[in-house]
Amino acid sequence: MSDAESTTEPWETSERLGRVEPSATLAIGNRAAALEADGVDVVDLSVGEPDFPTPANVVEAGKDALDAGHTGYTSSNGVPELKRAIAEKLRGDGIGASPEEVIVTPGGKQALYETVQTLVDPGDEVVLLDPAWVSYEAMVKLAGGELTRVDTAPSFQLEPALDDLREAVTDDTELVFVNTPSNPTGAVYTDAALEGVRDIAVEHDVAVVADEIYGQITYGDVEQTSLASLDGLAERTVTINGFSKAYSMTGWRLGDLHADEAFVGEAGKLHSHSVSCATNFVQRAGIEALRETDDTVQEMVDAFETRRDLVVDTLADAGVDVGVSDCAFYAMLPVDDDDQAWAEEAIAEAHVATLPGNAFGAPGYARISYAASEDRLREAFDRLFDHGLL
């Protein structure tokens, strides 16, 4: 070794990155992709991504925007017509929204990240409802926040856990995350539960993040109530949404947040200094998605509902109760106590990719996504049965 060579790592990275691990969802997806690259047929039930194409008219709107030269910067918070369309949708959900209260972001994840960075200082208390989407925890830790977790298992409904939430939230709590319709559980919280959140938030003067990205993917007579539509919550709620799930636009990267103008003014500083703006032509496609895709979205939702029934019925026939999801395209499958080992065996032996529940704060479960064809779902369960995993 020469004198010039160093025995230390070349980069001394920030302490904050040591607080988090890589995304568990992406890690499993990468492992599935590596197996497939080696010629292995993997049934991937790990990814939270619709298997339907982006609606054709939305794709055409994106192409038209490119042809029209919409390739430069936009106003940092988004093009006015898209913000108007988002505000119109929010008003339909009972939220008194104006375009000035909207920030358009490159994906719903960016909207969440900007919200946490805007509200959370080192040492601030943040409450999560478990099971919770994996990136909430990472975002809070990157901001230096301290987590308190409230378990909703085994029902995965918030209403039975309201007393636990009341105990968890104090005057020192800065923020509560509420994700309904829920990833990973497929639960839609009752109005009584949401009113309980409202009462707790008002009592302790706490801000609420309402992640409603699955709001258009609900089944039967189930309807989602937007938290910010409740009296007393509009002025303390940041509503997060995006285009990835309902419009099958995951790779387009388009999302949004809504809050009062005071919050938007502060969050807009971070937004402008970090991402400048969401991609111009993608925003134009988003306008088309909001205004001209109701029938296409409903067709996708109907297909997901059929798949949900297939999952529930197939597992019920084997004596496994996963409950009936009210929304999204996920089911929480009860497995051995060591869910990490179960998920690793499922992909290594059965070549079925799932996600261990511990990644969501739900040990003893695996999350399966039914954003896959009925044939592939049947194939996945056949493999899991054959390998003694069910």
Model regions and ranges:
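PLP-dependent class I/II
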Residues: 2-8, 21-23, 28, 35-42, ...
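Short, contiguous pre-domain boundary segments
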Residues: 8-16
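Glycine-rich phosphate-binding segment of PLP-dependent enzymes
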Residues: 54-73, 87
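Short, surface-exposed loop/turn segments at secondary-structure junctions
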Residues: 73-74, 298
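Conserved AMP-binding/adenylate-forming core of the ANL superfamily
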Residues: 82-86
